[in-house]
């Protein structure tokens, strides 16, 4: 290939001297495997170096398989985290958990021994819970079976179910089926009152101040028995001095219905009169103050209980204990006091039934 001729005065440099193109092209086109092997070796070396560097900074996860016993330093470091018990390997964390469980077990055994000592000291009378005691078991009878059934106080044989644990009711609480009467004419009313339920007590019409319910007797008797008993007491015992009442009779407020007066009985509200100016009690017989009056017996000092008075099956037959006392005193002292009072009877009237 002919080269171009350059002028002499030109400063051009020959390119073949600076860049031998023919030699470079020839080396690239020749098929030799040496440079490829060198390139592969260099790539592998650089990759291994990079992996080693990254391994130091990446955290390693613990393996679940126990390490093998080898003499290398890495294997000895891994064995330090594992504990060998017999033929088994456990980690340090599991070992600490086992220690805590053993401590709790010791505490539980100590508490159980303490409870057993207490039970042995108290004795064998204390039974453990849910333990069946020997002996027959009795069921308590219902409350409705304790009252007798049927009329006239005749109870059926199956009306009472007595259990050994249930306390027996007292006989005083049982209602008496037949009232105690001495008059034969009261036979039919007493039988009717025993078969029918008891009626509530009606308030008395004549006395203004009624005695409390605690002074009444639960066993009903006739009025004739109470009169005979009271007259026998008044004849055998001397009359005691009676004190005046501090509080006058309680009068209801507002309008009240007119009361039916019986001339044969003493009205206690009429016999007690209080002077509003001097606040003294006036005797109904001599119209004198209580201090200067010789009849100091007409005011009761303390309430006396008369069995059977004021409580009867018929409300019209109920008598006040104060009326009974006034009648008895008037009957006994009629011979001692010659004066007469229109409200006090001179003879004992017959009881009307």
From Swiss-Prot:
Where along the chain is composition biased (Basic residues)? 244-262
Q: State the family it belongs to.
A: Belongs to the SPATA31 family.
Which segments carry the region annotation Disordered? Answer: 122-271
Q: Where are the transmembrane segments?
A: 34-54
**Localization of this protein:** Membrane
Organism source for this protein? Homo sapiens
Query: Could you tell me what this protein is called?
Result: Putative protein SPATA31J1
Residue ranges under compositional bias (Polar residues)? 211-221
Q: Which UniProt keywords apply?
A: Membrane, Transmembrane, Transmembrane helix
Comp. bias (Low complexity) = 182-195, 222-237
Superkingdom classification of source: Eukaryota
The record's Gene Ontology cellular component field reads:
membrane
Q: How does the protein associate with the membrane?
A: Single-pass membrane protein
